[in-house]
Amino acid sequence: FLGGFTAVCVTDFIQGMLMLVGILAVPLFAYHFLTTGGTTLSAGLEASGADSANFLNLMKNGDGSNNIISVISGLGWGLGYFGMPHILVRFMAVRDEKEMTKSKATAISWVALSLGFAVFIGILGRAYLPELVNGNNEKVFIEMIKKVFTVEMRAPFIAGLFLCGILAAIMSTADSQLLVSAS
């Protein structure tokens, strides 16, 4: 229990749950606080200077031109997920086919939720944090946590827990990569 594959799996599960709760809760609270003031998401996007009609359309670029090549190439990203060494080793550890079915469903659900809500965070960030539109876009999740939990809710302890979720993502990947490279 103190090391090896089992320890990595246990810590990855705990860190993964922290990340999942954070990536689901933070944008939902931010959306609530955005819409409580009477602002809609599309109105917030328009106020931020983004062309909201094209911003929410997957087939258009920001300037209105077609984006089909970007969409097709973006679909290829999902194929690389199953070849990642730290993911592949988890599937190799499955005991039988019944567990493999559950493992696949869990992995697909995790990826769909995490990536879907990551996109939602990016879209919501333009409306909820308009000061980041032309600045530090990579800080959108951190700034969203700070605004929701320290400004709106006055709960800095919860903000700290969700900020730890970012560190959990880093540590989870690092220990999985170390395990794969050491074996």
Regions found by a protein language model. Give the residues of each.
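Residue-level recognition of membrane-helix boundary sites in multi-pass small-molecule transporters
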Residues: 6-7, 99-102, 160, 175-178
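Transmembrane helix-loop junctions in multi-pass membrane proteins
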Residues: 1-6, 121-132, 167, 174
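Loop-to-helix junctions at membrane interfaces in multi-pass transport proteins
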Residues: 17-162
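Hydrophobic core positions of alpha-helical segments in small-molecule transporters
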Residues: 11-14, 103-106, 182
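Membrane-water interface regions at transmembrane-helix termini and the short interhelical loops
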Residues: 1-15, 89-96, 167
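Membrane-helix boundary/coupling elements in multi-pass transport proteins
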Residues: 158-183
